């Protein structure tokens, strides 16, 4: 069996299967679309995240905790806030608009993000999934190796200003958030606790960036060529994974109905699974199903730069340093085969 590193297409349901399958439901039940209660699991994540951040600070300055434990508590604090800011930008963190925004800004501060940037850029992602020009997360996922995905989130800031996405006072909010970040770092340098900032904030933030990039951006949307709303993200069901990554293994449910809070993804999926089956929605991880899938994943782990034109890869200039013609041909073959060609939106 021969294997090639090519983006695999999701198999859509055949017309015969779609006609034969019972379609008793056209959308998710309304109960999942209602605003969350004032005290809900997302509020718990927000409070637990700040509690863990406080324990990390205490453990460094007072408790003398070992560094691995401090990195772990810092990582968990930021990991929880990743879900908080994500739900807040969809107004699904709290029913009251003020507290929803408060939680979003609070989560962003711990993560080193800007809440207006995250919100506007993420909504652009939802509007243009897998569009090479308009989806900012598409660039994050396809312009480098997975192990370097965290630094590519800075592209969101560039995208925010290039597209002039801010509204009303959001530019002021960005300035305050970034000013506060600079003040913290400068104060840390002057007062001698910069090692704490690097070890217990920046290092966990880097780890969380890889986690968010993998489970929020890369895995849900690979192989990055589907733009149909029923197939532009995937689901890989699992109870344990559901809690570890707080529902992002049901990412397609989130894209279809963004107002559903993370703790309802799983029951919402179970309610609409027959509909998703009819629509041909991908419901597997899609990495180990074939040799092509595995090779694509390994390519993305170590290199991950994908062109959108098979004859003009972003890595084509590497051919100049390859010593032999045979090696040049093999490299060009790989670069051409790894190109991503997104399908039309209604395909």
Residue ranges and their predicted role:
Residues 1-77, 108-203, 262-347:
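Non-catalytic, topology-defining segments of multipass membrane proteins
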Residues 61-107:
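Long, highly hydrophobic alpha-helical transmembrane signal-anchor segments
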Residues 76, 237-248:
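Long helical/loop segments within the catalytic core of UDP-sugar-dependent glycosyltransferases
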Residues 76-85, 114, 118, 203-227:
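Transmembrane alpha-helical segments that form the membrane-embedded catalytic/substrate-channel core
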Residues 81-91, 118-130, 217-223, 244-260:
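Histidine-centered catalytic micro-motifs
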Residues 93-113, 131-145, 227-241:
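Juxtamembrane helix-capping/reentrant segments at transmembrane boundaries
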Residues 172, 198-202, 225-235:
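Membrane-helix boundary/juxtamembrane motif in polytopic membrane proteins
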């Amino acid at each position: 069996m021969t294997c090639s590193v090519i983006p695999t297409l999701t198999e859509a349901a055949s017309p015969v299967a779609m006609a034969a399958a019972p379609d008793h439901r056209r959308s998710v039940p309304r109960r999942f679309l209602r605003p969350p209660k004032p005290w809900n699991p997302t509020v718990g994540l927000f409070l637990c995240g700040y509690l863990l951040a406080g324990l990390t600070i205490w453990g460094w300055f007072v408790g003398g905790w070992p560094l691995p434990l401090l990195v772990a508590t810092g990582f968990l604090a930021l990991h929880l806030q990743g879900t908080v800011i994500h739900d807040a930008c969809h107004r699904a963190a709290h029913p009251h608009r003020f507290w929803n925004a408060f939680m979003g800004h609070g989560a962003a501060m711990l993560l080193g993000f800007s809440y207006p940037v995250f919100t506007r850029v993420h909504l652009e992602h939802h509007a243009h999934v897998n569009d090479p020009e308009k989806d900012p997360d598409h660039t994050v996922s396809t312009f480098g190796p997975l192990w370097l995905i965290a630094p590519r989130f800075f592209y969101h800031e560039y995208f925010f200003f290039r597209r002039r996405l801010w509204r009303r006072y959001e530019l002021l909010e960005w300035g305050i958030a970034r000013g506060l970040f600079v003040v913290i770092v400068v104060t840390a340098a002057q007062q001698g606790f910069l090692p704490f900032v690097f070890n217990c904030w920046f290092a966990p933030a880097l780890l969380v960036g890889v986690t968010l990039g993998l489970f929020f951006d890369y895995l849900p949307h690979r192989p990055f060529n589907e733009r149909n709303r029923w197939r532009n993200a995937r689901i890989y069901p699992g109870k344990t994974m559901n809690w570890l990554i707080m529902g992002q293994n049901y990412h397609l449910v989130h894209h279809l109905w963004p107002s559903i809070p993370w703790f309802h993804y799983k029951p919402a999926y179970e309610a609409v699974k027959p509909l998703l089956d009819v629509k041909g929605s991908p419901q597997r991880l899609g990495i180990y199903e074939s040799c092509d899938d595995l090779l694509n994943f390994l390519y993305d782990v170590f290199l991950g730069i994908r062109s959108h034109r098979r004859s003009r890869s972003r890595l084509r200039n590497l051919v100049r340093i390859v010593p032999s013609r045979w090696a040049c041909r093999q490299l060009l073959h790989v670069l051409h085969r790894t190109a991503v060609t997104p399908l039309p939106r209604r395909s």
